[in-house]
């Protein structure tokens, strides 16, 4: 498996040899930031196109097929259209909060995105409390959503924001308990160590039944945190027009739209990292030839392949199940998922204490 830290170390040494170390670090930070923004934009375009095609498939139609080959540049045209849209200033809104909200949502998404271990040696933020930082950074987004609902001075926006706040805060508990269950098995919160410790088997298989239960609960709760169907009550168009982004237009609306898809990818990427081995290839005990071939596939291909597989599962859920009521959503969390997650955590602790895992 190729280690990208060799390249990054060489770049750092080259820069520090021709300029002061502080300036070199500043240039590296700028380049990393530009790369994250570029990857963020590319992933958003791919995910939106994938969503439209998957939606078309489940509804027995073609999806976008006019602009470009197989509709491949339809999303780019939509981006250009959105860039030319006017950002409307509301007369009686709280302008500061109204304008701040989209940036808080997108910044929370960026911070969380920067934690993802794309390949060996290719992590922007890799420290010993990475899982804790990811959970903390992802919680910032709910503040932006609440500000959007309040600052818009619109009853539909406020109701949508309150629904979203209740939903995200509730389901964060199940996400946290599911990840904590796996942290007990993993013994670390550093993402690079989490992936490397799965070289001899992915945690979804090593943790017995509790790991599978944690994976299912994580997918359900992660889907709800992203406000994706069937948990899309905050933007239920039949009753709230567009929820908390009703009054937004132009790139302000675009930021919310981007954040939704990238948050879905982050949920999928974290699932791929913690449960499915991240950038670690598939190894089967006793099949040395097969394992050697798998090692030739670059780590980032494994990472994105697993992440997009989980994204497909999330899209499948959205376009299969009908929308739930807000009371059903909260009942599912507090009466079922939280108790099951807590019992599951205790079972995992017992498995680890008595050494019953693989």
Swiss-Prot record:
One of its GO terms (molecular function) is oxidoreductase activity, acting on NAD(P)H, quinone or similar compound as acceptor. GO terms for biological process: aerobic respiration. NDH-1 is composed of 14 different subunits. Subunits NuoA, H, J, K, L, M, N constitute the membrane sector of the complex. The chain crosses the membrane at residues 30-50, 96-116, 129-149, 168-188, 201-221, 265-285, 297-317, 336-356. NDH-1 shuttles electrons from NADH, via FMN and iron-sulfur (Fe-S) centers, to quinones in the respiratory chain. The immediate electron acceptor for the enzyme in this species is believed to be ubiquinone. Couples the redox reaction to proton translocation (for every two electrons transferred, four hydrogen ions are translocated across the cytoplasmic membrane), and thus conserves the redox energy in a proton gradient. This subunit may bind ubiquinone. The lineage of its organism: Bacteria, Pseudomonadati, Bacteroidota, Bacteroidia, Bacteroidales. Its EC number is 7.1.1.-. GO terms for cellular component: plasma membrane. It comes from Bacteroides fragilis (strain ATCC 25285 / DSM 2151 / CCUG 4856 / JCM 11019 / LMG 10263 / NCTC 9343 / Onslow / VPI 2553 / EN-2). It catalyses: a quinone + NADH + 5 H(+)(in) = a quinol + NAD(+) + 4 H(+)(out). The keyword Translocase applies. It is a multi-pass membrane protein. It is found in: Cell inner membrane. Its main location: membrane. This is NADH-quinone oxidoreductase subunit H.
